[in-house]
Amino acid sequence: MSKELKAFVKARDEMLLKGSIDELRSFVEENRGLYDDNIVHDILDCSDKVAEITLHKMITAATNLPFEYRMNSVAWLTERGYGHYA
């Protein structure tokens, strides 16, 4: 894994561990050159509810995060009737 990718994954994981939609939006804004413009606009312009769902889905898919933390997001999504990646 390249240094750049390692740094990105580390920053992403730190953002996900904060569990904040404001942090998610800031992260996407700061890294907008790495994402398709449609994804950037979707995250920056969506409702807080959609951003929160997206955050939890990202947490479930981030295998570097602690298992229990990921499972908390699985439970959060399941309780609300949403799918997950774990």
Annotate each predicted stretch with a short phrase.
Residues 1-32:
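Short terminal alpha-helical segments
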Residues 4, 23, 31, 52, ...:
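A general marker of short, structured functional hotspots
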Residues 6, 21-26, 50-60, 84-86:
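Amphipathic alpha-helical scaffolding segments comprising HEAT/armadillo-like alpha-solenoid repeats
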Residues 27, 34, 46, 79-80, ...:
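TPR/TPR-like alpha-solenoid repeats
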Residues 31-67, 71:
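Acidic, low-complexity, intrinsically disordered interaction modules
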